[in-house]
Amino acid sequence: MSLFTTRPFRFLTICRIRKKPVLCNWELLLVNASPDNQELKARVEQETARDNRIKSIILTENKGISENTNAGVAVASGDFVSFFDHDDILEPDLLFSYAEAIENNDNVDLLYCDEDKLMPDGKLAQPFFKPDFNIDLLRNNNYICHMLTIRKSLLDTLQPNTKEFDGAQDHNLTLRAVEKARNVHHVAKVLYHWRLSETSTAANADSKPYATIAGIKAVQNHLDRLGLNAKVEQARRPFTYKVTYAVPDSHPLVSIIIPTKDHANILDNCITSIIEKSTYDNYELVIIENNSTENATFEYYDKLQAKYPDIVRLVTWEHEFNFSKLMNFGVARAKGNYLLLLNNDTEVITPNWIETMLGICAREDVGAVGAKLYYPDNTIQHAGLCVTGGVAGHLCQSMPKDNWGYFALNDAQQDFSAVTAACIMTKRSEYEKVGGFTEELQVAFNDVDFCLKLREINDLIVYTPEVELYHYESISRGVENNTNKQIRFHKEVAYMNYRWANYYVEGDPYINPNFTVGEPGNRYYHL
């Protein structure tokens, strides 16, 4: 722990961990970068004299947070090294909780916990209940943040932080560590209290403007080390970063597969938005006709194919509606190696939507990419799915479009267990590897099942809020309003509960267990 102009009364609160020990095998390294502060120096000497587990490293001058911290790491003798700020508070059982996790999994190389804020009046507020390890969220922002703990043997292999990363030193260190870590473990307890002060980013995002610049460099260097062709820039919020992955040099064909029945005006709205707004030009539109009866629909097909003969292809599915069979049928007839499954009742908002999704999907570790969808009234319809609390549910549903939600998570590119197939891109190779869509799931949950099959082979499911569409939900199909549909729906629920029983028992790793997940539209918000 680095000490610099630390107020002695705040320094005393740090010692809670010593005065109420739950675990005895620890050392506390105090790196004093304020050698001329006699009051602080005296307090440090007093504490080291009282407990030989507390040790001090006295620097001749303040070298900046990165190099000050390096001085402590250099003399650390523990198997794990934890990093925390000089004016915050730890829960007494923090070390025990970490040690328990390490004891249960000897492959753990990095640990982190949930946290909240310590207000000026001494009250605790704003708990941040974090997901389990989420590499894309970590590239968006340092959500791991405080009480980062790294195995010393791994830490010794990493290049130390330098001054250029001051302000984002923890983010840079975390990114370097996760590149090599065998296992990253999240302790889902609030064990760290971040003190709110005017000079802290907890209260004032403008207090450290240099931190954002350092953060951009940290994320960019991380991507470069991994050989990922991507550009990093500041996102819409302080200390968050927008990562744009480059489209493969081959400029691959993207097959946009759209099932439809009647409602030519709805399909036209979708097709027109694609053709007029899309900035990526190497795509085909595979329209799956399914039992339309309206003359206007077939007239529209003829007009569309005549106007765009090189883009539009019409294929016909003459059997009863089964979304999974429809998509498998369309994929088999598509020409592209990248598949963009799209509902006919959607409307493109973002011009570079295809290349944004394609850049992410082309990554070797990604199985599918989903988008942010809005209802016509500009409220959120989809910002990722949580697989818990029944079968699955949309996150942030019905929130206003411009509301970024709990810790702005619906505005962050990140990994989820599933995304909706109303707009989803995947590789043909991955689609075929997991057997496409499960045809027993005629209407509901086939997208969730597909994503979980990808997760089963360790593919990531990425949600990107940089791609936005409107979704005029269920216009073609209608709602589940008769007995036969409801019977079918309950069979699909039973299938999911049986097929993915272990997933439901263990819980969705991307959704913190402290959240209420049983109320549609409120996931992420009720505690």
Model-derived regions, located:
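N-proximal low-complexity "stem/linker" segments adjacent to membrane-targeting elements
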Residues: 1-19, 220-276
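Nucleotide-sugar donor-binding/catalytic module of glycosyltransferases
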Residues: 1-207, 221
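Acidic donor-binding segment of Leloir-type glycosyltransferases
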Residues: 18-58, 275-316
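Glycine-rich, basic loop-to-helix element that forms the pyrophosphate-binding segment
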Residues: 59-76, 317-334, 352
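A recurrent flexible, glycine/aromatic-enriched loop bordering the glycosyltransferase active site
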Residues: 66, 74, 125-153, 166, ...
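Conserved donor NDP-sugar-binding/catalytic core segment of glycosyltransferases
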Residues: 93-125, 197, 346-391
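A short, conserved alpha-helix in the catalytic core of glycosyltransferases
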Residues: 154, 164-190, 219, 353-357, ...
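C-terminal, non-catalytic tails of nucleotide-sugar-dependent glycosyltransferases
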Residues: 208-251, 377, 389-416, 420, ...
